[in-house]
């Protein structure tokens, strides 16, 4: 089937599921599939099979793959492990080559980056941080991660930012909880992620009674506010976009903005945290559109 628009394979690789899609150059989804994240062999195998079945009718128009994946990832193109998930705590997935199965099966360009860097790109192209030079995308859900864009390009250094593993100041009413990160205990991920919330209180925020909920929300917002002030001090972002389920509970965004402003104490010239700290403009599609942005990058390399 000849298509006037280019077609891209897009993979949003998460810790619980891989979302797969064929998307055309107008950002229209032509085919979508969900594959549980089990073992690499099973998950990547089923992902390849989906595209093998979905692609033939678009074969003349297909351009490239973009993979926005959980990490950590090796993003050094000079390394033989470029495109590998490295020392993840997720069982079965350490030292997994994510790129090669798609390259070998389809023989086309493939670009990979972290899920949060992908979402940061998507929000910068089409969403809440469009028009900014410096922006951050943060997800606070099962885990905690962030991606930074400077002049529209993700920061890569030794690897990529691991924002969830910075160590925050402890809330005075939260000193007894050791945190849940297997590497650092009380890092941002270990204290403020959805996993940490459930381990600390035995339930999600939206399952709590009002009094318990308000106290828990203020504690989590305290950590996110300190995180924001650190970001503002280090890289001066014009926009901090917060995704993930934790941010969608009642009053969380308002509490994070308020506590950020209180901690910043009017120090940062021109910093209006009501405008800087926002939810994704692309909503729940930021991750998949991140994979699409990476597919566009793969085509143009």
UniProtKB/Swiss-Prot annotation:
Pfam families associated with the record: ROK
Catalyzed chemical reaction(s): D-fructose + ATP = D-fructose 6-phosphate + ADP + H(+)
Enzyme Commission no: 2.7.1.4
Gene3D superfamilies: 3.30.420.40
Activity regulation details: Inhibition by zinc ions.
Protein keywords: ATP-binding, Carbohydrate metabolism, Kinase, Magnesium, Metal-binding, Nucleotide-binding, Transferase, Zinc
The organism's place on the tree of life at top rank: Bacteria
Coiled coil (residue ranges): none
The keyword rRNA-binding belongs to this UniProt entry's keyword annotation: no
Named cofactor requirement(s): Mg(2+)
Residues that hold Zn(2+) according to the record: 165, 181, 184, 187
Molecular functions (GO terms): ATP binding; fructokinase activity; metal ion binding
Keyword Transcription regulation on entry: no
Family, per entry: Belongs to the ROK (NagC/XylR) family.
Entry protein name: Fructokinase
UniProt source species: Zymomonas mobilis subsp. mobilis (strain ATCC 31821 / ZM4 / CP4)
Phylogenetic lineage: Bacteria, Pseudomonadati, Pseudomonadota, Alphaproteobacteria, Sphingomonadales
């Amino acid at each position: 089937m000849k298509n006037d628009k280019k077609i891209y394979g897009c993979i949003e690789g998460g810790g619980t599921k891989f979302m797969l899609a064929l998307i055309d150059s107008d950002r229209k989804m032509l085919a979508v599939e969900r594959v549980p994240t089990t073992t690499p062999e099973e998950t990547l195998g089923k992902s390849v099979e989906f595209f093998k079945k979905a692609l033939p009718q678009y074969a003349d128009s297909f351009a490239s793959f973009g993979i926005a994946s959980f990490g950590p990832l090796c993003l050094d193109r000079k390394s033989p492990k470029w495109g590998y998930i490295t020392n993840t705590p997720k069982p079965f997935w350490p030292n997994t080559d994510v790129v090669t199965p798609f390259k070998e099966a389809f023989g086309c360009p493939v670009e990979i980056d972290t899920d949060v860097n992908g979402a940061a790109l998507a929000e910068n192209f089409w969403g809440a941080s469009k028009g900014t030079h410096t922006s951050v995308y943060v997800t606070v859900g099962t885990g905690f991660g962030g991606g930074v864009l400077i002049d529209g390009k993700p920061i890569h250094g030794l690897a990529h930012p691991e924002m969830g593993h910075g160590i925050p100041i402890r809330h005075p009413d939260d000193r007894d909880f050791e945190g849940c990160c297997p590497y650092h205990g009380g890092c941002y991920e270990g204290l403020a992620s959805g996993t940490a919330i459930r381990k600390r209180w035995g339930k999600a925020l939206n399952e709590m009674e009002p009094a318990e909920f308000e106290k828990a929300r203020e504690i989590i917002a305290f950590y996110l506010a300190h995180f924001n002030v650190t970001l503002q001090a280090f890289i001066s972002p014009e926009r901090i976009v917060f995704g993930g389920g934790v941010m969608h509970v009642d009053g969380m965004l308002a509490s994070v903005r308020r506590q950020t402003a209180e901690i910043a104490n009017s120090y940062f010239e021109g910093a209006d945290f009501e405008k800087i700290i926002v939810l994704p403009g692309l909503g729940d599609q930021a991750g998949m559109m991140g994979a699409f942005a990476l597919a566009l990058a793969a085509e143009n390399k």
